[in-house]
Regions:
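Extracellular glycan-recognition surfaces and repeat-rich motifs
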Residues: 1-14
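Secretory/extracellular carbohydrate-interaction modules
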Residues: 14-118
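Beta-strand-rich interaction surfaces with strong enrichment in secreted/lumenal proteins
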Residues: 25-32, 131-138, 175, 226-227, ...
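Extracellular Ig-like/FN3 beta-sandwich strand-entry sites
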Residues: 35-37, 142-144, 235, 248, ...
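Carbohydrate-binding surfaces in secreted/extracellular proteins
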Residues: 40-42, 125-129, 135-173
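Flexible glycan-contacting loops in extracellular carbohydrate-active proteins
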Residues: 169-201
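Non-catalytic, glycine-rich low-complexity segments
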Residues: 183, 188, 200-247
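Extended acidic/polar, glycine-enriched regions
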Residues: 245-308
């Protein structure tokens, strides 16, 4: 896996030179600049506190992959290598300097997103005509920042804000080709402090607003991906498959009758398989009997449900 949740942050586990540009797609959001302005922001830091990434490493947003003409699930596979309709990178490097880079131009005849090859910054050309300012981080001990992206018509602007609230780097450009902007929204982490064995960047406090940022609640997927069940000799056995969860999680199973929903079982989530297995005795019939699996992150106020 490329990603994990740690202390409320999304952490990229990969920093190797042959696994660059790891992406985590916000599949319930997309950009349509014809609808209005877009604002995105996220806090970024090296995944391992106290470490410093080189200027060849970067993190931030990948926007504009695909669009309404492409299935969003296909766009969500975009990572690693640039390709036609790949979109635009709005990123901050290990020195705290921001840049707008193209992710739609192939190099060396390669146009496959999931291959094992190195990608240099020269393979991700700077967007033409952009104006950049700022020297980035001034303190090697504090390599954290907030990255803000603003789109207004054809104008794209990004800035990195340091831990003391000061703007440490900016970039702005005019983008005449809407295909670079319209489409998917993703976070991207490429390389990191230690390309041999380290991790990439950590993201937290992701926010988005603006009439040009579209919301697609029907695209939400998880944390329960699917369920399988059997009923034999009045025993219900149901397995719920989760996405990657880590350790220390549990889920509940409810059945519904004429009186409403009733919890009938609980199960820990097995960290190796990311499955919760439920067993319920005394099941007379399961014909037209709704069930749901409930899950809540520790200390979370919102509960996720999967119904069948």
């Amino acid at each position: 896996q490329d990603w994990a949740i740690e202390d409320g942050a999304l952490v990229c586990l990969q920093a190797g030179n042959k696994k660059p540009l790891r992406t985590a797609h916000w599949i319930t959001r997309s950009i349509d600049t014809a609808g209005g302005s877009v604002d995105l922001s996220v806090d970024i830091a090296p995944a391992d506190r106290g470490s410093a990434a080189p200027p060849s490493a970067f993190a931030g947003f990948l926007i504009g992959t695909g669009g309404e003409h492409v299935d969003y699930r296909l766009s969500a596979l975009a990572h690693h290598l640039p390709a036609p309709d790949g979109g635009l990178l709005a990123v901050v490097d290990g020195d705290g300097v921001v840049a707008l880079r193209r992710f739609d131009q192939t190099f060396a005849g390669k146009a496959i997103w999931s291959v094992n090859t190195e990608v240099a910054l020269d393979n991700l050309p700077l967007l033409e005509g952009q104006t950049r300012a700022g020297d980035g981080f001034q303190d090697n001990r504090t390599r954290r920042c907030q990255l803000k992206l603003h789109i207004e018509g054809t104008i794209v602007a990004i800035k990195a804000i340091g831990v003391h609230g000061d703007v440490i780097s900016t970039a702005v450009a005019t983008v005449d080709d809407a295909n670079l902007l319209d489409g998917a929204v993703a976070m991207v982490s490429s390389s990191g402090p230690d390309a041999a064995k380290g991790r990439g960047f950590a993201f937290s406090h992701l926010r988005g607003s603006g009439e040009g940022l579209l919301h697609h609640p029907d695209r939400a997927y998880g944390p329960v991906l699917c369920t399988l069940y059997t009923v034999d000799q009045e025993v219900l056995k149901l397995t719920a498959q989760f996405g990657p969860m880590g350790e220390g999680h549990a889920a509940s199973l409810d059945l519904k009758n004429r009186d409403g929903w009733h919890q009938v079982a609980t199960s820990s989530i097995e960290p190796d398989s990311d499955t919760a297995t439920f067993r319920v005795n005394g099941i007379k019939t399961l014909i037209d009997t709704p069930f749901r699996v409930r899950f809540r992150e520790p200390d979370a106020t919102v509960e996720s449900t999967y119904e069948g």
